[in-house]
Amino acid sequence: MIASKETKEKIRNFIGGFASGAASTLAGHPFDTLKVRLQTEGSTGRFRGLAHCFTTTIKEEGFFALYKGVTPPLLGMSIINSCMFGAMNIVKSKIHTDKSTPISLGEIMVSGAITGWIVSFVACPIETVKSKLQVQYTGVKLYNGPIDCIKKIGIRGLYKALIPTGFQRNSLYAYFGCYELAQRYLRREDGSMTMGRSFIAGGIAGTGFWLTNFPFDVIRSRIMTMPYNESPPRYKGMIDCAKHIYRVDGLKGFWKGFSPCLLRTFPANGATFVAYECVMKFFPM
């Protein structure tokens, strides 16, 4: 039985997403580790800024400490991106029903927002494990690795940050919207995109994504990295966490870790779309 064109397109999107997730993780994980550490240090002031966080981490824990927690996202981001591109393709096909006309920017952005909430159910547990492992410093460790972490926190712990993750991932409207806009300006006269142009468009998409959701990402990181055995829990929920951040650090607290995030976003998201477009190119319909 020969697969239909629609089925082949779905499979191709899932494969492209898987490859893009691996590329994104390898390119951006060190910056992500610095981001999470700066976001979750609270009022203790462990680090004086991005440069100090980087040098302290290397000095105390070695270079590969920047890749702490990389196992879950290496596999996890591949799964997340696979679901993201696959779901985006399906949602777009449901929203844009008139195939005789090109899909509009508005339809792409609405599709991205819906996709964000769908993907949150996959992203939340994976990123919770990653974040918990990233903030383990030298000394006593709560978790011996991803499996031990999952066993200790359970299903409830894996999904504790689902709501802020949903709001954060909702910004896929900006991600895919910015990528589409960038493509329109960067395409060559024949309509094609080189790998370099795809990389730039991906970097722009990533920048748009983070600019529109970073405060939610800070809240999400705080909730994700709470010790599983803490009683009573530090935060009762997303709103309580937001109030605590504002009370302690003011508005600037919602932008902690933004510098490494911006440094990470171009290489990571550029690599994401280059890998994705390569799969689309080498596995034609």
UniProtKB/Swiss-Prot annotation:
The chain crosses the membrane at residues 14-34, 70-90, 103-123, 157-177, 199-219, 257-277. Residues 35-69, 124-156, 220-256 are mitochondrial matrix. The keyword Methyltransferase does not apply. PROSITE patterns: SOLCAR. GO terms for molecular function: L-ornithine transmembrane transporter activity. Mitochondrial solute carriers shuttle metabolites, nucleotides, and cofactors through the mitochondrial inner membrane. This is Mitochondrial substrate carrier family protein L. The lineage of its organism: Eukaryota, Amoebozoa, Evosea, Eumycetozoa, Dictyostelia.
